[in-house]
Amino acid sequence: KQAKQMFEQQSIEVKMHLSTFSGELIELAADLTTNDSDVVAVVGGDGSLSEVITGLMQAKSQCRVGLIPAGTGNSMANDLKLKDTEEAISRIVTGNYQLLDLAKVDMVAGLPGNENGELTRYSANLVTWGLGVDSTIKAEKMRWMGPMRYDVGILMAIMANNRRHATLTLDGHPIEDDFTLFLIQNS
């Protein structure tokens, strides 16, 4: 509501869409009708940003995306030096944008959360598999801890020492082994 009021004080039209479950922002963003001059401002954290980008990419939207940090970790906001809501809105209103590379991840059927078929996701921040996912799943069960839950989650995942047999293909070269973690970071 604070962000909406700040935009409206600048005479900027705002349409709000709220999510109620994980993955809903993908659907909401994919269903938006946008043009090149529109900005979709994401009020949330890294997960919300990734969902909105995925939905916009599915819709082949050419609009810009702004991030207003309101998540727990806010890794991307920290990388972009977005201190608070006011800073983020100021950059959006003045057109102060940073071009970012996106990672496109095509996941095969059978992965947790993707048992029924292939799935494509996009990320501007990071993509992780294995330990990173394990720690996030554990952290999500401890939301009451705030940002510290990520530290506790990673410690628990390290202690569990889960390794997975997989084939990673990089530049056409397959690497088959037991892995603890894959991580692609954009910062």
Model segments located where?
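Short beta->alpha junction loops/turns
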Residues: 21-22, 45-46, 81, 128
